Structure formats: C-alpha cells, structure tokens
C-alpha cells in the first residue's frame, strides 16, 4: 500500500521528489523542524518502503506557507492547525449530513481533518496525502480564498422584509 501511495503521489508531482535533507536545504530549515511539522500533522510527506521521507513540490509549498504564517504573521503551530481545521472537508468531499454530524472533522475545530482519528464513512480508508482536502491547500492563497468563500456562504443574511 505504501509503495502504491508513493507511486500514485509521485506521478502527480511529475516525479520530483526530495529527501528530507534535500527539502531542508531547499527550504533553508533544519531536518528536525521538518520532522516537527510532520509530527504536528502540518505536512504529510510520502514514505518509501524503507520509511525514508519524500517531499513533493506541493509539500515544499505547504512548508513555505507554514513558515510564512509563523515568521511573518506570528501564528503558532496550534493556530495553524485551527486555521486548517476551517477547511470544509465535508463540502469538498460531498459528505451526506448524517455522516457529517458524527464526524470529528466536522464537529471539532481543533485540527485539520487528516489528523482526526474518528473520521466519516468516506475517509476511514482514505489516504489523506492524496485527498483533495489535503492536496488543494498547499499554499496560503488557496487556503485564505476557501476560508473567505465559506465564511461568506455561511454568514446569515437578514431576511428580506417586504412592506
């Protein structure tokens, strides 16, 4: 399964994969920092059968976004997790209401859906790394736009009162 996941993800990135050392060099960060981001669930690198981490260009963009939030905007790792928890995975995946209401990813605002262990029907067997909820939000701009759109859609509108 891991090899299939790596091959599937590699084909989506045109085969451009970087070891943890190469990724750290490209990003000008330490290897322990990349491991911390993984432990905190902010990035889900691919794994070779040898368990070595592989980072795609999308992973590097995600890490750049994380670094920008931390360094430029002073957002903590917990704050980033809460921002990622705002991604409406149930909407993106089309979860039915009954599944959504029992899913921790819907009812909790503490962490992104890929960190929840009690997930809905569709996500129990899914590989989060290749899920559109995780894949589509590798940069800050798309995350910000989605949060704006969902906030606008869910903002109560005053009822039209006819005289």
Write out the residue ranges for each language-model feature.
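Basic helix-turn-helix/winged-helix DNA-binding cores
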Residues: 1-68, 72
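Generic structural signal for beta-strand residues in well-ordered domains
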Residues: 10-11, 82, 106
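Surface-exposed beta-strand edges and their flanking turn/coil or helix-capping segments
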Residues: 42, 57-58, 68-70, 78, ...
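Phosphate-coordinating loops and pocket residues in cytosolic domains that bind phosphorylated ligands
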Residues: 57, 82, 115
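Residue-level signature of transmembrane alpha-helix interfaces in integral membrane proteins
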Residues: 57, 75, 92-95
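Short amphipathic recognition helices of helix-turn-helix/homeodomain-type DNA-binding modules
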Residues: 69, 73-87
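Cysteine-cluster motifs in flexible loop/terminal segments that predominantly coordinate metals
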Residues: 86-159
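Intrinsic disorder/low-complexity detector
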Residues: 162-163
């Amino acid at each position: 399964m891991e090899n299939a996941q790596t091959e599937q993800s590699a084909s989506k990135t045109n085969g451009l994969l970087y070891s943890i050392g190469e990724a750290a060099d490209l990003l000008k960060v330490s290897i322990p920092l990349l491991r911390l981001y993984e432990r905190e669930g902010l990035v889900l690198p691919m794994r070779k059968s040898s368990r070595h981490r592989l980072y795609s260009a999308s992973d590097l963009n995600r890490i750049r976004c994380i670094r920008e939030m931390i360094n430029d905007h002073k957002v903590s790792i917990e704050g980033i997790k809460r921002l990622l928890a705002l991604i409406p995975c149930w909407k993106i995946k089309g979860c039915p209401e009954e599944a959504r209401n029992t899913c921790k990813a819907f009812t909790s605002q503490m962490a992104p859906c890929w960190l929840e262990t009690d997930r809905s029907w569709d996500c129990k067997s899914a590989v989060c790394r290749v899920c559109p909820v995780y894949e589509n939000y590798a940069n800050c701009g798309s995350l910000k736009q989605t949060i704006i759109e969902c906030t606008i859609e869910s903002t109560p509108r005053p009822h039209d009162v006819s005289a």
